[in-house]
């Protein structure tokens, strides 16, 4: 009597066309909880019939023995029969014939409440009555699966799809744990997937899926409950799982947590006892879990990191490694922390100590070595005994310059402008103007207040004239044209033009002063190349010579004052009498003082530029 209504009520339930069409839209609501969701009975039974086919029940008894579907219990459909040790504890096992009878018969006790909230415990615990198996063509609408076990009673259901919505309208059905923080360590000890379900495509025979735990949390990381190829839009596209790479780490609930990874990496770098995202509590077990999570993060990148929280928590648990960790080697241990340097404190719990140290300015002790002119003008006996300098120390260059300018150089009342810096080569010779003395003092203090304004250059200069000449290298300006007719050569500074003029006048003011050598040249670079032939041994390194092996730049003027410590007397012939006579400027007609800048205060501005712009001269004055 019941056969016509059933066949009339759901005639196309087992047609091949419907089954083929239903594969494109896999079930998205949680079919393992028939009492927690509220779709109509006929749509619910049709969805179960599409998912739990009698042929599938015969080959995979693990599907019928679990309250949740295979996509929610982290069990892939292609893994074969589930061993008894990997089933849910507390659930009864149904053999294959009984499973077929369950699929074909109707459960009279499985009723849903009108509000779709749940069912009574007596109705949920009643086993289905045995029934003879029917062929697939004669089977009626299958009943819903068995009710959930009592271990899942701590979950609450949220149905936002409505009572009349289909499977695609339940993409927002989630199962949430009430107290996750209290049960997360316990779930991690049993290898429960803490972040989501295991996708079927990421499983492999070498890495079987771990068994679920009753107290676990089974929430899809992508926001849907369809399979890998299932339809339906993801609720959270940013957390959608990407297919696992070959040979990758099969993780439960793969989620890209770049921020957490960066925080854990910073905690490991700065030696924090726990990651920054951990609560500041005295829970010893949570500290161990956090430390294991930081260790598991070692070796992974900070961007698009697949974080396996379950493996990290299980590594820190007191129990042995779970089934999932038995197939993987333990994560590599972090490298040993370097020994604390006295200038770089890396103390546990002080993550910002290094950054605070780097923000501090570099402390320097700048000592004023200005001598007292009154003591120098005293009797010779007191002067010979040694005049003590000022010896005041300053932390910044600005303080030192202000001290020398105000207290030693003086104001307009000073009539003589003499440098009394210790070991100054001028030996008390005055300057004509105060600004010249101030520019000269920068040679002793090292002040360079004129930086290059071009980005990326980074050069600084002691005088504004030197900066003006340097900027021509960026702009390409060459305002000094050769004065001889027929020559179109242009130069960035006047000194280079003067050196070039010797080519037209046939003057050779640079000659070799070694005995027996009467060579002379029009340019100092040619003389420097010539001096290499007087070396009996191979030429030493450029640093030992004081200039490059091919000669110093053309723009550098030559000075007769050379540092004795930078000479190469050991490599020259014994015929050399005076090393300072290597580079001598011959006077042709009028006295030429361009290449031997004097320090008597009568030099022109161009000569002053060369003197202060030449780094070699600055080194010799020191």
Swiss-Prot record:
One of its GO terms (cellular component) is nucleus. Keywords: Developmental protein, Differentiation, DNA-binding, Metal-binding, Neurogenesis, Nucleus, Phosphoprotein, Repeat, Zinc, Zinc-finger. It is found in: Nucleus. Essential for neural crest development, converting cells from an epidermal fate to a neural crest cell fate. Binds to DNA. A zinc finger (C2H2-type) spans 422-444, 450-474, 480-504, 510-534. GO terms for molecular function: DNA binding; DNA-binding transcription factor activity; RNA polymerase II transcription regulatory region sequence-specific DNA binding; zinc ion binding. Residues 595-604 have a biased composition (Polar residues). Disruption phenotype: Mice exhibited insufficient neural tube closure at the rostral end and malformation of neural-crest-derived facial bones especially the mandible. After birth, mice were significantly smaller than their littermates and most of them died within 2 months. PROSITE patterns: ZINC_FINGER_C2H2_1, ZINC_FINGER_C2H2_2. It comes from the Eukaryota. This is Zinc finger protein ZIC 5. SMART domains: ZnF_C2H2. Residues 126-151, 329-340 have a biased composition (Pro residues). The modification Phosphoserine is found at residues 537, 541, 559. InterPro entries: GLI-like, Znf-C2H2_ZIC1-5/GLI1-3-like, Znf_C2H2_sf, Znf_C2H2_type, Znf_ZIC. PANTHER family: TRANSCRIPTIONAL ACTIVATOR CUBITUS INTERRUPTUS. GO terms for biological process: forebrain development; neural crest cell differentiation; neural tube closure; regulation of transcription by RNA polymerase II. Belongs to the GLI C2H2-type zinc-finger protein family. The gene is Zic5.
């Amino acid at each position: 009597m019941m056969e016509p209504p059933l066949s009339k009520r759901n005639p196309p339930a087992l047609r091949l066309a419907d089954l083929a069409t239903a594969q494109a839209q896999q079930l998205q609501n949680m079919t393992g909880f028939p009492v927690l969701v509220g779709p109509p009975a006929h749509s619910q039974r049709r969805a179960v019939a599409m998912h739990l086919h009698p042929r599938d029940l015969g080959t995979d008894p693990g599907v019928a023995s679990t309250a949740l579907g295979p996509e929610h219990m982290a069990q892939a459909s292609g893994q074969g029969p589930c061993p008894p040790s990997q089933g849910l504890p507390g659930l009864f096992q149904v053999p294959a014939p009984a499973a077929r009878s369950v699929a074909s018969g109707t459960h009279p006790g499985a009723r849903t409440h009108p509000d779709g909230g749940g069912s009574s415990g007596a109705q949920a615990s009643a086993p289905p009555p045995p029934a003879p198996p029917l062929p697939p063509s004669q089977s009626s609408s299958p009943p819903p699966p068995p009710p959930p076990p009592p271990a899942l009673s701590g979950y609450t259901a949220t149905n936002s799809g409505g009572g009349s919505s289909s499977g695609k309208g339940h993409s927002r059905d989630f199962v949430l744990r009430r107290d996750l923080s209290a049960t997360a360590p316990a779930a991690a000890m049993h290898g429960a997937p803490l972040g989501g379900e295991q996708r079927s495509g990421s499983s492999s025979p070498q890495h079987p899926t771990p068994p679920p735990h009753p107290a676990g949390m089974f929430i899809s990381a992508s926001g849907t409950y369809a399979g890998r190829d299932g339809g339906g839009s993801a609720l959270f596209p940013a957390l959608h799982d990407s297919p696992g790479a070959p040979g990758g780490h099969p993780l439960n609930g793969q989620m890209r947590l770049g921020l957490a990874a960066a925080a854990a990496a910073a905690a490991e770098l700065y030696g924090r006892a726990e990651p920054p995202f951990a609560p500041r509590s005295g829970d010893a077990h949570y500290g161990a879990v956090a430390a294991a999570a930081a260790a598991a993060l070692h070796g992974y990148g900070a961007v698009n990191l697949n974080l396996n929280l379950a493996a990290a928590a299980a590594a820190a648990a007191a129990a042995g490694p779970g089934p999932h960790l038995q197939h993987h080697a333990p994560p590599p241990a972090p490298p040993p922390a370097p020994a604390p340097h006295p200038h770089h404190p890396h103390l546990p719990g002080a993550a910002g100590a290094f950054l605070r140290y780097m923000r501090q300015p570099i402390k320097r002790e700048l000592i004023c070595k200005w001598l007292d002119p009154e003591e120098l003008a005293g009797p010779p006996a007191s002067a010979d005994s040694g005049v003590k300098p000022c010896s005041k120390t300053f932390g910044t260059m600005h303080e030192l310059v202000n001290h020398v300018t105000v207290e030693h150089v003086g104001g307009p009342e000073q009539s003589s402008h003499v440098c009394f810096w210790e070991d100054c080569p001028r030996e008390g010779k005055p300057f004509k103007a105060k600004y010249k003395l101030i520019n000269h003092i920068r040679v002793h203090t090292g002040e360079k207040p004129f930086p290059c304004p071009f980005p990326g250059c980074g050069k600084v200069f002691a005088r504004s004239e030197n900066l003006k000449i340097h900027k021509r290298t960026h702009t390409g300006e060459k305002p000094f044209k050769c004065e001889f007719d027929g020559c179109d050569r242009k130069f960035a500074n006047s000194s280079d033009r003067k050196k070039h003029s010797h080519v037209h006048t046939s003057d050779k003011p640079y000659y070799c002063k070694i005995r027996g050598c009467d060579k002379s040249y029009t340019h100092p670079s040619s003389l420097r190349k010539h001096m290499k032939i007087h070396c009996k041994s191979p030429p030493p390194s450029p640093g030992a010579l004081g200039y490059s092996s091919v000669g110093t730049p053309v723009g550098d003027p030559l000075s007769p004052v050379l540092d004795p410590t930078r000479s190469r007397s050991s490599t020259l012939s014994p015929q050399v009498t005076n090393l300072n006579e290597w580079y001598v400027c011959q006077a042709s007609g009028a006295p030429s003082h361009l290449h031997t800048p004097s320090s008597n205060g009568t030099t022109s501005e161009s000569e002053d530029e060369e003197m202060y712009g030449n780094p070699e001269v600055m080194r010799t004055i020191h």
